[in-house]
Regions:
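Active-site rim elements
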Residues: 307-312, 355-363
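Short, charged low-complexity intrinsically disordered segments located at boundaries
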Residues: 159-170, 295-308, 358, 397-410
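Short acidic/His/Gly/Ser-rich catalytic and metal-binding motifs that mark active-site loops
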Residues: 58-61, 98-110, 160-166, 249-254, ...
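Non-catalytic accessory regions flanking glycosidase/transglycosidase catalytic cores in CAZymes
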Residues: 1-152, 172-209, 213, 280, ...
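Noncatalytic carbohydrate-binding groove/subsite architecture in carbohydrate-active enzymes
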Residues: 181-331
Length: 513
């Protein structure tokens, strides 16, 4: 039995919530009914910032005289909804309009709504600056500087991969094309920064949001700190945060048991490497934004292609998420934002198909969604626990306090090797110096609680469940409590048995005298 203790009156350390943020994909689902259904469910306060694309392919055309014409009407539908819903935004400025492209035929494959994006660099970088300025100014005019200055803006998505200039990944290119790809991105960033800050110096900009290749990030950070600015001719370019993508694994690793390496530590280690590059270039004090993270890349692939993607449907992902929060919070400088990537939503045609989503095709909340909702209950003051120096393998615990004095104790048992059995771990939590009167809530995510996937599986995985079967599944498609709320006075002793890949949170609410 592991015993964990907390003095409820102890001072804590401020740790702002960096974990409740989302990359919502595809962006143009924001205007659709199914997109609204998802976003409405997230209006419970669990999502702080949401990342979207500007989708310049919907914005830019040319007039008959060859000058650029900007039409933000399609974009306005999306951002109007997001602002009205109370979301703060991180906007990724991409992709290139065909009308502006140096290579207009450099198009992606078919995407949502039969659209394609253009990966080309601009034919004229002054036009790119003009577009970035017009975009920023339009947002300020429409929503006000007070609102927009709270947002984040970054330049392009994964320029080291097949989204920028060439369809090949960085490592697949010969040295001269690698150099060209980096040089052109640095130029793109300089003109992006100039255009946005011509609208207002109060807007925060960053990049490069690379998908994997650290040498690309290294060269970009070298440019913004020591290189010659392509616009001003001076040394350096303003950067307010460094953005990055951190995926624990790629599908090929997931599919091969010998290379299976999904674990929160993988994401943390990648973040540390990026932090090291920031420090190398004198940017160690800047915020870092992980604007995409997930346990595995390529959310548009599911169980059909990679059977082990079943973990996206199960309690495994919930425990993974809580361990990731715990590990990141222990770092000297955690990320300012960490955005879980939901980029399989438009491929979600049947329930529990392994795509990277919060909800199934019928709208049932997966365990990872319940975990995201549960994590939003955590406070922003971290409290030290006693008895956590030598915890059993896979067991983790951390405590927080909210501004109103409520206390949250998070416990998890995460078995990284998905599909392998682990031990159930008994835990006792003792808390002293509590108020004279308080209530205790306990939330649970495991194989049974808050787990519609298990309920569906036990019914035989029906493709067309009956009304009664849907009812049985729906009862677990929400954040569940394993026991009724309790009353307490001055101190609390709580016992639990953490089964493999389970999460439990004890929430203590002070009652007025």
């Amino acid at each position: 039995m592991t015993t964990i203790q907390l003095n409820a009156r102890i001072e804590g350390i401020s740790k702002p919530n960096f974990w409740n943020n989302i990359h919502f994909h595809p962006t143009d689902a924001v205007e659709d009914l199914w997109g609204h259904e998802i976003l409405e469910k997230l209006r419970d306060g669990s999502a702080r910032y949401i990342r979207l694309y500007t989708m310049f392919e919907d914005v830019v055309t040319r007039n008959e005289d060859g000058t650029l014409q900007f039409d933000f009407s399609e974009q306005d539908k999306r951002f109007d909804y997001m602002v009205a819903a109370g979301y703060k935004l991180l906007l990724c400025f991409n992709f290139m309009s065909v009308a502006m492209a140096k290579s207009p035929n450099e198009l992606s494959g078919q995407r949502y709504k039969d659209k394609r994006f253009c990966r080309s660099n601009p034919a004229d970088y002054h036009e790119w600056e003009q577009l970035c300025h017009a975009q920023a100014q339009h947002l300020i005019d429409r929503y006000g500087l007070e609102t927009v200055s709270q947002w984040l803006f970054h330049c392009w998505n994964e320029p080291d991969l097949g989204f920028w200039i060439y369809p090949e990944f960085f490592f697949e290119l010969p040295p001269e094309k690698q150099e060209y790809k980096i040089t052109e991105y640095c130029k793109l960033y300089d003109y992006f920064e100039t255009g946005i800050h011509r609208a207002s110096p109060k807007l925060r900009v960053g990049g490069p949001s690379c998908g994997h290749y650290k040498v690309f990030v290294d060269k970009v950070l070298e440019h913004v700190t020591k290189g010659t600015n392509y616009v001003t001719g001076k040394v350096g370019t303003r950067i307010d945060f460094v953005s990055m993508h951190c995926y624990s694994s790629i599908p090929q690793d997931v599919n091969d048991p010998l290379r299976f390496k999904i674990c929160p530590e993988s994401i943390v280690n990648q973040y540390k490497v990026y932090r090291g590059l920031m420090e190398k270039h004198g940017l160690g004090e800047l915020p870092a934004v992980i604007d995409e993270w997930a346990a595995a890349a390529e959310g548009y692939l599911g169980i059909k292609e990679y059977p082990r993607f079943q973990f996206r449907e199960s309690e495994y992902y919930a425990a993974f998420y809580f361990k990731l929060i715990d590990l990141m919070a222990q770092l000297p400088i955690p990320p300012e934002r960490m955005m879980i990537c939901l980029s399989g939503q438009d491929h979600n045609s049947v329930d529990f198909d392994g795509h990277r989503t919060f909800f199934t095709a019928r709208g049932w909340a997966k365990p990872i969604r319940s975990a995201f909702q549960l994590a939003a209950k955590l406070g922003e003051t971290c409290l030290p626990l006693e008895g956590t120096d030598a915890l059993p393998q896979n067991l983790g615990a951390f405590a927080t306090r909210t501004e109103n004095g409520d206390i949250q104790i998070a416990l998890y048992n995460h078995v990284s090797d998905f599909g392998q059995s682990g031990d159930s771990l008994p835990v006792t939590v003792k808390i002293d110096n509590l108020p004279a009167s308080f209530t205790v809530e306990r939330y649970r995510i495991d194989e049974l609680f808050s787990n519609p996937f298990t309920a569906w599986s036990r019914l035989g995985s029906p493709s067309t469940p009956t009304v009664w079967e849907r009812e049985l599944i729906s009862r677990h498609a929400r954040l569940e409590k394993p026991r009724p709320d309790e009353l307490g006075s001055h101190k609390l002793t709580a016992e639990t048995l953490l089964t493999p890949n389970s999460v439990e949170m004890i929430v203590i609410h002070s009652l007025a005298d």
